A protein has these predicted regions:
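Structural marker of alpha-solenoid helical repeat scaffolds
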Residues: 61, 65, 99-100, 133, ...
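Register position in tetratricopeptide repeats
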Residues: 44-45, 83, 116-117, 150-151, ...
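Canonical positions in the second alpha-helix
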Residues: 58, 96-97, 129-130, 163-165, ...
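C-terminal motif of bacterial Sec signal peptides marking the signal peptidase cleavage site
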Residues: 19-22
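Canonical tetratricopeptide repeat
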Residues: 37, 69-72, 76, 83, ...
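Start-of-helix register in tetratricopeptide repeats
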Residues: 33, 67-72, 105, 139, ...
Length: 320
């Protein structure tokens, strides 16, 4: 995941017009943080319009200079805008961040949205700018590859992976990211060697990617061994657990997949709750437990009534 980076700079006129503003009194800071948390909760529950409103109210609490908290809220606001269908609003928010501090993450994320709008020229321009601002960031190269691959530009995406491999690994995280790249390129031996270096340096997250490399290689036993190590560490987030569950789905291990999905839903923070809940329902269905699948789908439809695909799936489950 691309990580937010923040810079303490002077506020521009465009941002003071309401997009961004700074920290105020301690009371306003508490209100800001409360609105921020409420917005995050709304995203987790699929209430994206409410999330946008909450993040804007959080920003409205600020008076003075911009800090990391305000920029963090703007990133959340842009995410909520995109998820709500307000693509242009999300672009405007990322543009405001870019105008403020030229952050490479904002360029990258705006580029992703341009690709979603079928504007690959603007998307590529933003990707190139992001990498020019931060050309030693493995995660940026990986993100660019994944986006290009998603939109049918796999060969161009691989060029960015090759560029990333020309960087010199200096840290355990670097070795882990290189392992991810080798996995994407199908060079599993190199991936395992690189990931082992990261594991030897006590980077727990590398166990997850080691499990992924073995899973891609078809070695499910070794994959489970490393996934379990990562799960036992307590560091797995809901995205990791969903991916581990999906890997088990691919191998037909539906009960294990359900365990991963449920573990994810039991976490304190589950920003991808809707996707996990839906995946778990499918896992129950594939396992043959149609009664549980139907029961959970009923609860899902109450929480996410606008999901038309789920409504069609529910009609199918009613016939089982």
């Amino acid at each position: 995941m691309i990580k937010n980076k923040f810079m303490a700079l002077t506020l521009t006129v465009a941002l003071t017009a309401g997009m961004l503003s700074g920290c105020g009194s301690s009371e306003k800071a508490k209100d800001r943080d409360a609105y921020r948390q409420y917005g995050i909760n709304c995203i987790e529950n699929g209430s994206y319009d409410d999330a946008v409103d909450a993040f804007q109210k959080a920003l409205d609490q600020s008076v003075g200079s911009v800090g990391a908290e305000e920029l963090d809220i703007c990133y959340y606001k842009a995410k909520a805008q995109y998820l709500s269908g307000d693509v242009d609003g999300a672009i405007d928010t990322y543009t405001a961040i870019i105008d403020y501090n030229k952050d490479s993450d904002a360029y990258y994320l705006r580029g992703c949205i341009y690709f979603a709008k079928n504007d690959s020229d603007k998307g590529m321009k933003d990707f190139k700018t992001a990498l020019s601002e931060n050309d030693d960031n493995y995660e940026l190269y990986l993100g660019v590859y994944e986006t290009l691959s998603k939109y049918g530009m796999n060969d161009q995406g691989k060029e960015y992976l090759d560029k990333a491999l020309k960087l010199k690994a200096k840290t355990a995280d670097d070795y882990m990211q290189r392992g991810r790249i080798y996995t994407m390129l199908g060079d599993y031996d190199s991936a395992i060697k690189s990931l082992q270096k990261a594991i030897d340096e006590k980077l727990v997250k590398a166990n997850y990617y080691m499990g992924e490399a073995y899973q891609k290689q078809g070695d499910n036993d070794s994959s489970q061994k490393y996934f379990k190590k990562y799960l036992d560490s307590g560091e797995a987030d809901s995205y990791d657990l969903m991916n581990m569950g999906q890997a088990q789905m691919d191998n037909g291990n539906y009960d294990t997949a359900i365990t991963y999905f449920q573990t994810a839903l039991d976490l304190e923070s589950v920003p991808n709750k809707q996707q996990i809940t839906k995946a778990m329902i499918i896992a129950y269905e594939y396992s043959g437990d149609f009664a549980t699948a139907k029961s959970q789908m009923e609860e899902y439809m109450k929480e996410y009534p606008d999901d038309e695909d789920a409504a069609r799936e529910y009609q199918f489950l009613e016939t089982r």
